Swiss-Prot record:
TM spans (from-to): 30-47, 119-134, 143-157, 198-219, 275-289
Residues that hold chlorophyll a ChlzD1 according to the record: H119
Additional detail: Cyanobacteria usually contain more than 2 copies of the psbA gene.
Enzyme class: oxidoreductase
Organism: Prochlorococcus marinus (strain MIT 9312)
PANTHER family for this protein: PHOTOSYSTEM II D2 PROTEIN, PHOTOSYSTEM II PROTEIN D1
Any one GO MF annotation of this record: iron ion binding
Residues that, per the record, bind chlorophyll a PD1: H199
Residues under site feature: Stabilizes free radical intermediate: H191
Catalytic activity field: 2 a plastoquinone + 4 hnu + 2 H2O = 2 a plastoquinol + O2
Name of the protein in question: Photosystem II protein D1
Function according to Swiss-Prot or TrEMBL: Photosystem II (PSII) is a light-driven water:plastoquinone oxidoreductase that uses light energy to abstract electrons from H(2)O, generating O(2) and a proton gradient subsequently used for ATP formation. It consists of a core antenna complex that captures photons, and an electron transfer chain that converts photonic excitation into a charge separation. The D1/D2 (PsbA/PsbD) reaction center heterodimer binds P680, the primary electron donor of PSII as well as several subsequent electron acceptors.
Binding-site residues for Fe cation, renumbered to this chain: H216, H273
Gene that specifies this protein: psbA1
Length: 360
């Protein structure tokens, strides 16, 4: 009894030291309580992803006994390779390795995909919490983790919400380059995402954010306060932690205000950097919301055959061109799982060709 109490007391003495180490901001890399969850989850996801990308056997993704190979050892390269999503025969069932009769069955049904995405989603969520935790420890404001929530929401949209809405993890995004593009093509074919306003906002956020980042960086670099000679690197003119400003915001404001017009230029550094952060973040949030709505088939705008002349004859538009492309992609994907896409199998015929030549 005495021995057991001594062991417990020694463990209790070590616990406060462990807590202090986990929450210490003096470590070279901050761990944090969220890090205790993040590190094993991301390591598990990375390890399974690497092994599956190299050596996983083909997966029966459509549930029709026609396996699709995605690994290096089965003939793929870095472009065509992927961790193939779990089988449509599994649907939305949670499919850990102990639910399969054998490891071979688990691999055949795409079990590694679920292992990777679940650990990955938990890991990046914990990483976001770790950002908040470190900001809290250092007395900083919490907006870093808020900005990071944009890519986190995108990951949850394509890996979790979309499969939930479609009824199967086989509809999730494959973990590979060509698999990602295949996912994008199929998404366009089935949901017309290019005509969804939230996707348009996301495109504006990505391209606009890149433009604003380049504009800001070039303006700052062009208005640095000279601290060095011509023979020295201008980077030597800045000392880490210096109090004085390293560039002339008045000069940058004056330049940009004259290049476009006065009120297009920020005269407040804080509001400028807030805008640089909030614009792409909000746009990516909107894109994630768009994916989540289209997951439940609330799709993009449909302008098929929407313009007619005085005689009621259809005047083809770019909406009809886009519809024709969508039908082509929809016919090609899962070609052995379905006879026709839903659009072609409908009672009313859909005009595919914009025009046909006269024969005879």
């Amino acid at each position: 009894m005495t021995t057991i109490q001594q062991q417990r007391s020694s463990l209790l003495k070590g616990w406060p030291q462990f807590c202090e180490w986990v929450t210490s901001t003096n470590n070279r890399i901050y761990v944090g309580w969220f890090g205790v969850l993040m590190i094993p989850c991301l390591l598990a996801a990375a390890a399974c992803f690497i092994v599956a990308f190299i050596a996983a056997p083909p997966v029966d993704i459509d549930g029709i006994r026609e396996p699709v190979a995605g690994s290096f050892l089965y003939g793929n390269n870095i472009i065509s390779g992927a961790v193939v999503p779990s089988s449509n025969a599994i649907g939305l069932h949670f499919y850990p390795i102990w639910e399969a009769a054998t490891v071979d069955e688990w691999l055949y049904n795409g079990g590694p995909y679920q292992l990777v995405i679940f650990h990955f989603l938990i890991g990046i969520s914990a990483y976001m919490g770790r950002q908040w935790e470190l900001s809290y420890r250092l007395g900083m404001r919490p907006w870093i983790c808020v900005a990071y929530s944009a890519p986190v929401s995108a990951a949850f949209a394509v890996f979790l919400v979309y499969p939930f809405g479609q009824g199967s993890f086989s509809d999730g995004m494959p973990l590979g380059i060509s698999g990602t593009f295949n996912f994008m093509f199929v998404f366009q074919a089935e949901h017309n995402i290019l005509m969804h306003p939230f996707h348009m906002a996301g495109v504006a956020g990505m391209f606009g954010g890149s433009l604003f980042s380049a504009m800001h960086g070039s303006l700052v670099t062009s208005s640095l306060i000279r601290e060095t000679t011509e023979t020295e690197s201008q980077n030597y003119g800045y000392k880490f932690g210096q109090e004085e400003e390293t560039y002339n915001i008045v000069a940058a404001h004056g330049y940009f205000g004259r290049l476009i017009f006065q009120y297009a230029s920020f005269n407040n550094s804080r509001s400028l950097h807030f805008f640089l952060a909030v614009f792409p973040v909000v746009c990516v949030w909107l894109t994630s919301m768009g994916i989540c709505t289209m997951a439940f088939n609330l799709n993009g705008f449909n302008f098929n055959q929407s313009v007619v002349d005085a005689n009621g004859k259809i005047v083809p538009t770019w909406g009809d061109v886009l519809n024709r492309a969508n039908l082509g992609m929809e016919v090609m994907h899962e070609r052995n799982a379905h006879n026709f896409p839903l659009d072609l199998a409908a009672a009313e015929s859909t005009t595919v060709a914009l025009s046909a030549p006269a024969i005879g």
